Amino acid sequence: MSKIIIATANKGKAKEFEKIFAKFNIEVATLADFPEIGEIEETGTTFAENAALKAETVASVLNQTVIADDSGLIVDALDGAPGVYSARYAGVAHDDAKNNEKLLKNLEGVEPDKRTARFHCTLAVATPSEKTSFYTGEVEGVIAEQLCGTNGFGYDPLFFLPEFGLTMAEIPAEKKNEISHRANAIKQLEKDLVEVVEKVTKK
């Protein structure tokens, strides 16, 4: 069976990709399967740079096609912050609670109609000796004034979806997987999936 590498150790992300490649009889492997690679430092200043950094680094080491993603929250009232620093907004510890606390503090006094935001995801598909391809997806919302919901992770409890009247942490996981920024980026990737599959199967 052919195998595609997803440059992540996140099991949730891996499952999303597994669903796509299963119909092509392609197995999904993650960085958890290659502990010798270790953590790749995200030194880019854009989502595309970080996604490419991860995908190209792993593709070079393993000499095969690799998919990586970089995603985050963009808040208009904060000039795009936390952006590429979303996971470490309150420090390097990737602490969801502290990140949410800092976000709420920085938005104190901001009117509801000025709290517009979006989740963004960029996927990078890297193959050795070939140009890296990029696919993006977003979902629009508003930052709530308090945490609501227990599903999801990260900023989900604060990301309010007006069309549903719920935060991302309140909607069912199945619905989130349909409308999320990552889901929308994957939909773009699916348009070129046959080409990606060919790169994997010819190895």
From Swiss-Prot:
Catalyses which reaction(s): XTP + H2O = XMP + diphosphate + H(+); dITP + H2O = dIMP + diphosphate + H(+); ITP + H2O = IMP + diphosphate + H(+)
Pfam families registered for this protein in UniProt: Ham1p_like
InterPro entries: dITP/XTP_pyrophosphatase, ITPase-like_fam, RdgB/HAM1
GO cellular component, one term: cytoplasm
Free-text comment on the cofactor: Binds 1 Mg(2+) ion per subunit.
Chain's role: Pyrophosphatase that catalyzes the hydrolysis of nucleoside triphosphates to their monophosphate derivatives, with a high preference for the non-canonical purine nucleotides XTP (xanthosine triphosphate), dITP (deoxyinosine triphosphate) and ITP. Seems to function as a house-cleaning enzyme that removes non-canonical purine nucleotides from the nucleotide pool, thus preventing their incorporation into DNA/RNA and avoiding chromosomal lesions.
Protein family (similarity comment): Belongs to the HAM1 NTPase family.
This protein's name: dITP/XTP pyrophosphatase
Native organism: Listeria monocytogenes serovar 1/2a (strain ATCC BAA-679 / EGD-e)
Top-level taxonomy: Bacteria, Bacillati, Bacillota, Bacilli, Bacillales
